[in-house]
Amino acid sequence: MLRIAVPNKGALAEAAREILQEAGYRQRRDSRELVLVDPENQVEFFYLRPRDIAVYVGKGTLDVGLTGRDLFRDAQVEGTAEEIMALGFGRSVFRLAAPVGTFSSESELTGRRIATSYDGLLHAYLERTGLDAEVVHLDGAVESSVKLGVADAIADVVETGSTLRAAGMEVFGESILDSEAVLICRAGERPEGLDVLLRRLKGVLVARRWVMIDYDIRRDLLEAATAVTPGLESPTVSPLRDETMVAVRSMVRKPDANRVMDELYALGARGILISAIHAIRL
């Protein structure tokens, strides 16, 4: 049975539940549940603190886990676990920040104190850049550290930047890490059931980005129409009772759907229909 670690709370928890549910896996109904067995799919889910997931997978206690790339890298378990799929949600950036106007470059941090909850990420960055600064560990609310005299700057995960702005801070220097939700796996032989999980998750990600389009068009306009709707590989073309007409089915990217419909209508297509894709295997 495949053992999967899932965030039990926080920004990643709900999105992780949704993608797994769309992939056909049972999910807990009570947030107090710590373990859920899905016998039909031969999977066991363990609901853990997002920060601990990489540790459990890295030690081989659990097979795979859904967590943030920032948390995975911060745990420093790359030798015993690996990132195998980006999941496209929970995007953020690990950045340096300080009160507005304090610093303009990371080079100005030499000999200064940097507060963070991501010691592993920050130490790796300092080592990579050769920057000599003191790391001050805090479990959270690092924005207050400068005002309270504990640090001169902070290194933290930034999503919208609203929290920093409210604290009178701004980011500076380069982006240290671009993060998003990822699937990680323990090192060594791939566990049984992982390939099915990967196919299902990939199918959900594709289904979220694409829609199905159906339309009728005159046979002599088919080439022009299919140039607008080439699909992933090739559109499906079916004859109609009226031999001068054909029916076309293809996949188009969801953000392009209305533009494509307009172009097809202008070409002469009619009966243009968009439908959602709930699952797909490629």
Swiss-Prot record:
Gene name, Swiss-Prot/TrEMBL: hisG
Chief localization: cytoplasm
Keyword flag Glycosyltransferase: yes
PANTHER family xrefs: ATP PHOSPHORIBOSYLTRANSFERASE, ATP PHOSPHORIBOSYLTRANSFERASE ATP-PRTASE
EC number assigned by the record: 2.4.2.17
Domain of life, source organism: Bacteria
Known catalytic reactions: 1-(5-phospho-beta-D-ribosyl)-ATP + diphosphate = 5-phospho-alpha-D-ribose 1-diphosphate + ATP
Record-stated family: Belongs to the ATP phosphoribosyltransferase family. Long subfamily.
Cofactor(s) annotated in UniProt: Mg(2+)
Pfam family, one: HisG
Pathways per UniProt: Amino-acid biosynthesis; L-histidine biosynthesis; L-histidine from 5-phospho-alpha-D-ribose 1-diphosphate: step 1/9
GO MF term (any one): ATP binding
Source organism: Micrococcus luteus (strain ATCC 4698 / DSM 20030 / JCM 1464 / CCM 169 / CCUG 5858 / IAM 1056 / NBRC 3333 / NCIMB 9278 / NCTC 2665 / VKM Ac-2230) (Micrococcus lysodeikticus)
HAMAP family: HisG_Long
Keywords: Amino-acid biosynthesis, ATP-binding, Cytoplasm, Glycosyltransferase, Histidine biosynthesis, Magnesium, Metal-binding, Nucleotide-binding, Transferase
Regulation: Feedback inhibited by histidine.
Localization, UniProt: Cytoplasm
GO biological process, one term: L-histidine biosynthetic process
Protein role: Catalyzes the condensation of ATP and 5-phosphoribose 1-diphosphate to form N'-(5'-phosphoribosyl)-ATP (PR-ATP). Has a crucial role in the pathway because the rate of histidine biosynthesis seems to be controlled primarily by regulation of HisG enzymatic activity.
Name used for this protein in its record: ATP phosphoribosyltransferase
A cellular component annotation (GO) from this entry: cytoplasm
